[in-house]
Amino acid sequence: MSEQRIIRPTPISGFPEWTPRIRSVELRWLDHIRRGFERYGFSSVETPSVEVLDVLLSKGETSQEIYTLQRLQADADDSSDARLGLHFDLTVPFARYVAQHFNDLVFPFKRYQIQRVWRGERPQEGRFREFTQCDIDVINVDRIPLHFDAELPRIVHEVLTGLDIPAWTLNINNRKVLQGFYEGLGITDPLAVIRAVDKLHKIGADAVREILIDQAGLSSDQAAACLELAEIRGSDTTVVDAVAKLGVSHPTLTAGLDELGEVLDELSDLPSGSVVADLSIARGLDYYTGTVYEATFNDDPGYGSICAGGRYENLAGQFIRRSLPGVGISIGLTRIFAKLVSEGRITGGRFCPTDVLVVLPSDERRSAALAVAAQLRERGFNTEVYHQAAKIGKQIQYAVKKDIPFVWFPPFDDGRPHEVKNLATGEQVEADPASWNG
């Protein structure tokens, strides 16, 4: 008989997984984020992991980053799954969802969505092929008030401040500022410039200047003006004055500066430096039309954005004949969490949910031990019974290794009292499973 082939398990690059101890911290983070979103009245939504490819490609995402779905043993003429792909973000699926369920929703519709997404990127530090995003969006019929553009950064500030993460800054810009400035310079394809400027922090000013001149067709003076705009940064409305000094005028530019100033005013009560207007922030996706956000770690801005989003005027327009503008922002949970794990800032917490371990002195006592466990569970204590009869010391060691705080000793002889031991203090006392309070 031939030996069974052993498949050596190896990690898959770009697909992170955690030990139970680390995962317990991630779950607490997820619960904290969920509660933060719900405090502001956002409702939970979940969409399928897959969408029709036409939906995923409807807003300009590159097809190279989309994982398609097909059965391994699919027939050559079976195309039923050929047009399905894993979603690369949660915004486009959300737009499809709103259009599909339009008559069942109350507007403005405030939703949060915490799910995994997939992108066919080259794995590297801070970039994964499977990761968790935590999104909030507000979408409305015909018009969405600008104050929502300020509410979302406020929510993110509260949520991230409640997590033990390194200092970070949320940078804000407005696509109308960029588009109006570029059009005021006589640039005919502002989107091409926006995509180039979006790479500024990754490839540097010289490389962006080269793209602007060689690929976007700008003159040297136009490219210089675009880069000069991108250097403007400030935590208050003085950025508006700085743009005015560049001497470019356009109605769209004026509208964008007005919106940017209003959002900054509404966020002026947040701690100094936590929200900054940064006119280099562009966000390369085509569907953003107004306010855009991008947050980075202060001590490692090159790590990439940990939170991003923006305003869109008609994201659902290809799915329904209604105007449905919205604004959204997404927290990159996996990117933040993985950095802290790799740096040793997260070493894990109490990973086992068990509150009480009921020892099993003998197989004959299993029924009695199970009855004790049932009583404790009814009273709200997560309880497990040791899996087999064994020496008491071995069972206690099991509890210690799993961070179980209490060990319960049923009567070894009929008529004797129950006892419970607190492993943190070493105290062991008599207790009644029907009334014990922990």
From Swiss-Prot:
Any one GO CC term of the record: cytoplasm
Pfam families: HGTP_anticodon, tRNA-synt_His
Catalytic activity: tRNA(His) + L-histidine + ATP = L-histidyl-tRNA(His) + AMP + diphosphate + H(+)
Main location: cytoplasm
NCBIfam families linked: hisS
Family stated for the protein in its record: Belongs to the class-II aminoacyl-tRNA synthetase family.
Name assigned to this protein: Histidine--tRNA ligase
Encoding gene per record: hisS
